[in-house]
Amino acid sequence: MRIILLGAPGAGKGTQAQYISEAFGIPQISTGDMLRAAVKAATPLGLAAKKIMDEGGLVPDDLIISLVKERIAQPDCANGCLFDGFPRTLAQAEALRAGGIRIDHIIEMNVPDEEIIKRMSGRRVHLASGRTYHVTFNPPAVPDKDDLTGEPLVQRNDDCEETVRKRLKAYHELTEPLVGYYRNLSMNGSADAPKYSRIAGIGTVEQIKDEIIATLNG
């Protein structure tokens, strides 16, 4: 089964992707990992991508699609794969389909923006240990202090509300059109159209996991 997991940053895709990968015995595939592996292995595609990146350019979609084809032909993808952070744009989704790469199921994790802002802007981190807290969901015993050392907790720049809002804006402009694209594709009934399922990404991690796994098994 080949799966694409869609959702805004902070929707919980990373956590659920691990569960899906384990449940179905399929690898997570990210374009970043693919590019690094191809460059390291010095494959023709990897060398072409490296030349573009070394010149400060963006790797074009046709090269990314070729890398995807190369990757999914490997033995660990025999039972499928889970695409992680790809496709990001409508052009990539269309190129994926034009390239004859069949996708079986699209899962959209739907979480309102204000919930994502609350989740992300409430995170606090103890830098030395990496211990993570949340001011609402997992607060430290003493506000803004690490439970074990008493040292100060910090809010990472990525978690500041202004940054989160910018990332959500970019998601809505670039990636959200994929939701409509795949939903319409699913509804038009063409033979190669993937199934499309929207999951509410609110609830416990276990509840969301169970719903996603049941949906994929359905």
UniProtKB/Swiss-Prot annotation:
The keyword Transferase applies. Pathway: Purine metabolism; AMP biosynthesis via salvage pathway; AMP from ADP: step 1/1. Pfam families: ADK (PF00406), ADK_lid (PF05191). It is found in: Cytoplasm. GO terms for biological process: AMP salvage. Keywords: ATP-binding, Cytoplasm, Kinase, Nucleotide biosynthesis, Nucleotide-binding, Transferase. Its main location: cytoplasm. Belongs to the adenylate kinase family. This is Adenylate kinase.
